[in-house]
């Protein structure tokens, strides 16, 4: 005789007990996954911070970093300027063997009909290494601060004027490094046999497709002389008040 199976109510109680146990086990098992996600996000922020610090050490080199902010103009009271104003100023600072140059341009234009005022402030800064230094082989990072044109409504009460924030950011042109393609062109990685095969292919193209050859030579010359892509780094600067 086989053993008797448990009655239906007992089976239902057993299933309910298993479901309760599963609800207790699943949250405890899912907790480490949440902690792992938080840990990965914190590692990502740490990596971004180290990347920015490495960039500063690589291109701004210590004492240059301390003198960069002096290139940008101090806050100016634009309301005290005339309705139409233009100013350009060039400055140079010597830091060690490097020369820091800045060009400041301020424009203020007033619409006599509407009373709106457009203000533009541009600062272009560059770092020029000394001649013969190792840094001279690289393109100098170019830093630019742009202040967006901000319309200011004509003030009806001189004692109650609103402050309008301005947008500012830095554009840093990253140094160009020699590409892998240029390095291969400078080496002797192509053999004589490959050169001969390429010459045969070019000769066949000349005999069969003259028009295609002309377009091909133009495209090949353009591809060889095509400029490299310029890489720019945009850094948002805290806005100032007018």
UniProtKB/Swiss-Prot annotation:
The keyword Transport does not apply. N-glycosylated during spermatogenesis. Not N-glycosylated in mature sperm. GO terms for molecular function: co-receptor binding; receptor antagonist activity. Induction: Abnormal expression in testes of patients with male infertility. Keywords: Cytoplasmic vesicle, Glycoprotein, Secreted, Signal. InterPro entries: DKK1-4, DKKL1. One of its GO terms (cellular component) is acrosomal vesicle. Glycans are attached at residues 97, 112. CDD domains: Dkkl1 (cd23006). Contains a N-terminal domain similar to that of the N-terminal section of DKK3. Involved in fertilization by facilitating sperm penetration of the zona pellucida. May promote spermatocyte apoptosis, thereby limiting sperm production. In adults, may reduce testosterone synthesis in Leydig cells. Is not essential either for development or fertility. This is Dickkopf-like protein 1. It comes from Homo sapiens (Human). The gene is DKKL1.
């Amino acid at each position: 005789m086989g053993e008797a199976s448990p009655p239906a109510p007992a089976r239902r109680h057993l299933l309910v007990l298993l479901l309760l146990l599963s609800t207790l086990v699943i949250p405890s098992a899912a907790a480490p996954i949440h902690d792992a996600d938080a840990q990965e996000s914190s590692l990502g922020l740490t990596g971004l911070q180290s990347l920015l610090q490495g960039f500063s050490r690589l291109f701004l080199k210590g004492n240059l970093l301390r003198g960069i902010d002096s290139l940008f103009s101090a806050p100016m009271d634009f309301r005290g300027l005339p309705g139409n104003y233009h100013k350009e100023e060039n400055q140079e600072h010597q830091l060690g063997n490097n020369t820091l140059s800045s060009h400041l341009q301020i424009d203020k234009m007033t619409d006599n009909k509407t009373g709106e005022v457009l203000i533009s402030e541009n600062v272009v800064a560059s770092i020029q290494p000394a001649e013969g230094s190792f840094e001279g082989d690289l393109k100098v990072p170019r830093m630019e601060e742009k202040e967006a044109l901000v319309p200011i409504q004509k003030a009806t009460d001189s004692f109650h004027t609103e402050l309008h924030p301005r947008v500012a950011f830095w554009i840093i042109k990253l140094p160009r490094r020699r590409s892998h393609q240029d390095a291969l062109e400078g080496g002797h990685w192509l053999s004589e046999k490959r050169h001969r095969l390429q010459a045969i292919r070019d000769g066949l193209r000349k005999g069969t497709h003259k028009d295609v050859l002309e377009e091909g030579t133009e495209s090949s010359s353009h591809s060889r002389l095509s400029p490299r892509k310029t890489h720019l780094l945009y850094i948002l600067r805290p806005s100032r008040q007018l």
